[in-house]
Swiss-Prot record:
Biological process (GO), any one: protein stabilization
UniProt-listed Pfam families: OmpH (PF03938)
Organism phylogeny: Bacteria, Pseudomonadati, Pseudomonadota, Gammaproteobacteria, Vibrionales
Gene Ontology MF annotations: unfolded protein binding
Source taxon at top rank: Bacteria
Name by which UniProt lists this protein: Chaperone protein Skp
Task performed by this protein: Molecular chaperone that interacts specifically with outer membrane proteins, thus maintaining the solubility of early folding intermediates during passage through the periplasm.
Assembly: Homotrimer.
InterPro entries: Chaperone_Skp, Skp_dom_sf
Family according to the record: Belongs to the Skp family.
Cellular component, GO, one term: periplasmic space
Record Gene3D superfamilies: Skp domain (3.30.910.20)
Keywords, comma-separated and alphabetical: Chaperone, Periplasm, Signal
Cellular compartment(s): Periplasm
Amino acid sequence: MKNMIKAASLGLIILSSSMMANAAEAAQKIGYINTAQVFQALPQREVVLQKMQEEFKDKAAELQAIQADAKTKIEKLKRDGQLMGQDEVEKLRIEIGQLDSKYKIKAQALEQASARREAEEKQKLFKVIQDAVKKVAEKEGYDIVLDTSSMQYGKPEHNLSEKVIKAIK
């Protein structure tokens, strides 16, 4: 009976020590980054912004020209409307309406094209960030890296943002 109790105790000790070993193995090193901070620090971000402004400069200038033309015609209608004949006033109003429609269509197309290009470029930049995060996480021995937007608290020593920024630059 005593031997049975000793054997059971020994079995429990071995079992509990193996459970502790498994628990220690299961502990993972978790870090975090502030993706927005890293994104703002990207040197490529400014280059991409300038490239996009250059790409859409002509279309923006065209919109400004349409807007200026419409403004000129509206001012002419206000200034000379009383002196103009009914047909001329009606013709000018139609032209203003057409310019307004043209402006709205072109502005919407520019907005959509700009948003699409911005999304494409952001996707490329986030890929750069992901690669840098992976590189830093592997180098530092982190199993998981979260974004600050998905967590409540993290010890400052597990913040990898600055290390990721340095890896990108």
